[in-house]
Amino acid sequence: MNWNRKPLRALTLTVAVLLPMSSAAQADLPDAPGTVSTPKAAPEPTGPTIVIDTTMGRLTCKTFIRQAPIAVSNFIGLAEGTKEWSLDQGKTKQRGKRFYDGLLFHRVIPGFMIQGGDPAGDGTGGPGYYFDDEVDPNLTFSVPGRLAMANSGPNTNGSQFYITQVPVPQLDGKYTIFGQCDAHSVDVVTAIANVERNASDRPLTPVRIEHVTIVREGQPMPPDPNPPAAPAAMPAAAH
C-alpha cells in the first residue's frame, strides 16, 4: 500500500470532521431525522484501561473492547511495542519499540479536541498500514472525553487519535470511538487544548506523551509521575 499519507486534520466545529489539510471536500452534516426513535442505552467500556502520562498531566481512558476490538488491540499493540509498524512504507519493519512514547499532541483546538499519535508530528504520519472503521450506532460523541481514531477518510485508521473536550455530535458515525476518559482527564484535555498555538493549531510549547501504560483487569494503576496538587488547607479560625 502506498503510504503517502495526507494530514489527518481536526477542523473547527463548523465543519467538525477530521479531514486532510489539502482536501477541498467537506463532509456534509447529517440531515435532521424524519422520525424520532428511542435510542438504546450507550454501551459501557469494559476493556483494558489506557493511561497516557503527558507533560501536562495524566489521561486515563477505559476502552470499548466489545465495540471496537480492532482499534483497541491496535492501540495496545503499538503502545506496548508488540505490534509491527513501519515509517518508510513498509521497507523497514519495527517491533519491540513503544510507538507512542515521546510523540506530540500536534493539533489542539479549544472547545473541541486534542490530537496526537503521529510519528511525523505534523498530521501526515502513521504506522505504515490502515485498518477499517468500527462504528457502533449506540456509541456516540454525546459526552466529553471520547477517545477516537483520527482518519483521512473511511477505513484509514492507523495510529493517530484524538480526545474530545466537549460533546461533538457532528462526528457521530464518522470515526471509531474506542475509549472513554474520566473527568480528571477531561480537565487535562481542556488545559492542553487551551495552550498557546500557531495558525495550524500546533502548540507553541510542545505537549508530549511521556509514557503509555495499559492496565488490565486486576492490575494496579501505575504511580502518577505528576499527581494533581492537593487543595490548600483552610487557615485555622482565629480564637
Language-model region placement:
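Cyclophilin-like peptidyl-prolyl cis-trans isomerases
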Residues: 2-9, 22-239
